[in-house]
C-alpha cells in the first residue's frame, strides 16, 4: 500500500519546475500558479493560468518542488482526475491541462466542453 495521497488534480514535475523558474525570475517567492476555468473559447469553457500571491477560502493547493498550484472550488469540479503539465515543442512552450472530463477540445487545447 502506498503512502502517497491521491489528489483530485495532478501537478507534474515539468510544470512545477517551470513554475519554480518563473517565480525565481519574478523575485517574489509568495507567487503560486493558479489554474482556473472560465466560460468562453470555441468549445464553451477555457483554461486560464495566472500567478497569484493569495490563497482564498476553499482553494485547493498542491505543492511540488517547493511551489504551489492553486485551484478554486468551482474550477476544481471540472478538473478532477486531470493534470497540469508543461510542454515544449514545435508549437512553442505552454502549460497544458489534461482533462478526462472534457467531451471535446478545440485544436489549440485551451478550450473544452463537458
UniProtKB/Swiss-Prot annotation:
Instruction: List membrane-spanning regions.
Output: none
One GO cellular component from the entry?
cytosol
User: From which residue to which does any coiled coil extend?
Assistant: none
Query: What is any one GO biological process for this UniProt entry?
Result: iron-sulfur cluster assembly
Sites where the protein binds iron-sulfur cluster: 42, 106, 108
Q: Supply the Gene3D superfamilies for this chain.
A: HesB-like domain
Give the Gene Ontology MF terms in alphabetical order: 2 iron, 2 sulfur cluster binding; 4 iron, 4 sulfur cluster binding; iron ion binding
Q: Does the keyword RNA-binding apply?
A: no
Keyword flag Glycoprotein: no
Arranged from A to Z, the UniProt key words for this protein are:
Iron, Iron-sulfur, Metal-binding
Needs which cofactor?
iron-sulfur cluster
Q: Which SUPFAM superfamilies does UniProt cross-reference here?
A: HesB-like domain (SSF89360)
How is the cofactor bound, in the record's words? Answer: Binds 1 iron-sulfur cluster per subunit.
Q: Which NCBIfam families match?
A: iron-sulfur cluster assembly accessory protein, PRK13623.1
Quaternary context: Homodimer.
Q: Family per UniProt? A: Belongs to the HesB/IscA family.
The record's function comment reads: Required for insertion of 4Fe-4S clusters for at least IspG.
Q: What is this protein called?
A: Iron-sulfur cluster insertion protein ErpA
Organism of derivation: Yersinia enterocolitica serotype O:8 / biotype 1B (strain NCTC 13174 / 8081)
Amino acid at each position: 500500500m502506498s503512502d502517497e495521497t491521491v489528489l483530485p488534480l495532478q501537478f507534474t514535475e515539468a510544470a512545477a519546475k517551470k513554475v519554480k523558474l518563473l517565480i525565481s525570475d519574478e523575485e517574489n517567492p509568495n507567487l503560486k500558479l493558479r489554474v482556473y476555468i472560465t466560460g468562453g473559447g470555441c468549445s464553451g469553457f477555457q483554461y486560464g493560468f495566472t500567478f497569484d500571491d493569495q490563497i482564498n477560502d476553499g482553494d485547493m493547493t498542491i505543492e511540488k518542488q517547493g511551489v504551489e498550484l492553486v485551484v478554486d472550488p468551482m474550477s476544481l469540479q471540472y478538473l478532477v482526475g486531470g493534470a497540469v503539465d508543461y510542454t515544449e515543442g514545435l508549437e512553442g512552450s505552454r502549460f497544458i491541462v489534461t482533462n478526462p472530463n472534457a467531451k471535446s477540445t478545440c485544436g489549440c487545447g485551451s478550450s473544452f466542453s463537458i
